[in-house]
């Protein structure tokens, strides 16, 4: 088991010239620099980019469907890193309604878990193949009010890592917290991010 070293890559616009800030969370086996390359396919030219790096390139050791205790202390440490990225954006003068979150796979799960536990009117959330974390969901963990925050969740209909039932369950929980959730499921899509998904993210969340 492990906790995360504090590593945060800052890229994109300087805070003084940015219209928004975006926290990007990489998937298992990837890196902060890898997820930053996704910014070239999203409408983020006006954004300050903040990308935490997971120790061992993994936010938590087991499946996101494992009992939460099995993924500790790495999971709580990872959530803390996301919180520090949000605090960094605030320190640089970015209001919550100009703060966005983007994640893929394990990073998408972490994004949804973080915002679900800290719901407020954010700028928007993009989860490419992800769902809320845990063997079963502890609904009391998810508090606050998104105030209509747009949240996009995309996935394939038979993803090998993120089952559709958990994606749908997660969308329901987030809607209950006041988010405007768009759920897009692609038949036969592999475990990756497709051009259709980035186009939809630009339209639904970033436009």
Segments from the language model and where they lie:
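Serine-hydrolase catalytic machinery in alpha/beta-hydrolase-like enzymes
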Residues: 2-97
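C-terminal catalytic histidine-bearing segment of alpha/beta-hydrolase fold enzymes
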Residues: 28, 168-175, 179-207
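Short alpha-helix in the alpha/beta-hydrolase fold that links the catalytic acid
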Residues: 35-38, 139, 163-173
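Active-site signature of alpha/beta-hydrolase-fold catalytic machinery across serine-
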Residues: 37, 113-117
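Short beta-strand immediately N-terminal to the catalytic nucleophile in serine-hydrolase-like folds
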Residues: 101-103, 128, 154
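Gly/Ala-rich beta-loop-alpha elbow adjacent to hydrolase catalytic centers
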Residues: 102-107, 111
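A conserved short beta-strand
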Residues: 120-133
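Short beta-strand/loop motif that positions the catalytic acidic residue
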Residues: 152-155, 159
């Amino acid at each position: 088991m492990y906790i995360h070293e504090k590593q945060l890559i800052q890229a994109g616009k300087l805070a003084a010239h940015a219209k928004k800030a975006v926290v990007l969370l990489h998937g298992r086996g990837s890196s902060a620099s890898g997820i930053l390359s996704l910014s070239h396919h999203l409408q983020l030219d006006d954004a300050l980019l903040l990308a935490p790096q997971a120790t061992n390139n993994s936010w938590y050791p087991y499946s996101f469907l494992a009992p939460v205790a099995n993924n500790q202390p790495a999971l709580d440490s990872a959530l803390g890193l996301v919180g520090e990225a949000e605090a960094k954006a605030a320190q640089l003068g970015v209001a919550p309604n100009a703060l966005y979150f983007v994640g893929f796979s394990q990073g998408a799960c972490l994004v949804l878990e973080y915002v679900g536990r800290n719901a407020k009117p954010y700028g928007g959330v993009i989860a490419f193949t992800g769902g809320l974390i845990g063997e079963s969901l502890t609904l009391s963990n998810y508090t606050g009010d998104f105030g209509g925050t747009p949240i996009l969740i995309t996935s394939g209909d038979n993803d090998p890592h993120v089952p559709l039932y958990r994606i749908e369950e997660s969308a329901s929980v987030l809607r209950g917290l006041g988010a405007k959730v768009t759920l897009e499921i692609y038949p036969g899509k592999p475990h990756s991010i497709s051009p259709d998904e980035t186009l939809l993210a630009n339209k639904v969340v970033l436009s």
